[in-house]
C-alpha cells in the first residue's frame, strides 16, 4: 500500500480514515490523535452544532476540526516552524478558517437572525480555542 504524505489541510474525517488504513506517511515523532485532548468540532458538540444555521453547514470545519496540544501551546512566532515540520496545529482563530466562514456567509442568503447566529458561532469558535478547546467538547 502506498503512503500519502501528511497534509495539514485534511479534514478530521479524512485524517482518521487514512490513519485507520495506515496510509499516512508521518514525520518522526508525529503526535497521535487523542480524542480526550484534541479539539472536537460541531459534530461532537451539540451546543456548537445548534448554533450553525442549516444554510452554512457546508463551512469547511476541517480547517478547524483537529488541533493538537503541541500546536495549541505553540507561541505565534513558532507556529510557522511547526507547520514546516508538518505537525498538527489547527487553531480556530486561524485567519483561513475565519475567511472561509465569512466567504461562505457572503454566498448564502440568511435572515438577519440567522446571520447574527452564524457570526456568533464564529466568535464562539474563535474564543473556544483561546480559552481552551477541549473543555468545550461533549465527552
PLM features: residue spans?
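Extended terminal accessory/targeting regions
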Residues: 1-139
Amino acid at each position: 500500500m502506498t503512503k500519502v504524505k501528511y497534509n495539514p489541510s485534511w479534514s478530521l474525517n479524512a485524517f482518521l480514515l487514512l490513519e485507520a488504513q495506515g496510509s499516512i506517511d508521518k514525520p518522526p515523532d508525529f503526535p497521535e490523535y487523542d480524542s480526550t485532548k484534541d479539539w472536537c468540532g460541531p459534530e461532537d458538540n451539540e451546543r456548537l452544532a445548534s448554533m450553525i444555521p442549516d444554510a452554512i453547514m457546508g463551512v469547511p470545519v476541517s480547517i478547524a476540526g483537529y488541533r493538537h496540544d503541541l500546536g495549541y501551546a505553540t507561541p505565534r512566532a513558532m507556529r510557522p516552524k511547526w507547520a514546516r515540520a508538518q505537525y498538527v496545529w489547527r487553531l480556530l482563530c486561524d485567519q483561513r478558517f475565519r475567511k472561509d466562514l465569512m466567504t461562505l456567509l457572503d454566498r448564502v442568503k440568511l435572515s438577519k437572525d440567522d446571520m447574527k447566529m452564524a457570526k456568533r458561532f464564529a466568535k464562539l469558535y474563535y474564543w473556544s480555542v483561546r480559552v481552551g478547546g477541549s473543555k468545550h467538547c461533549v465527552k
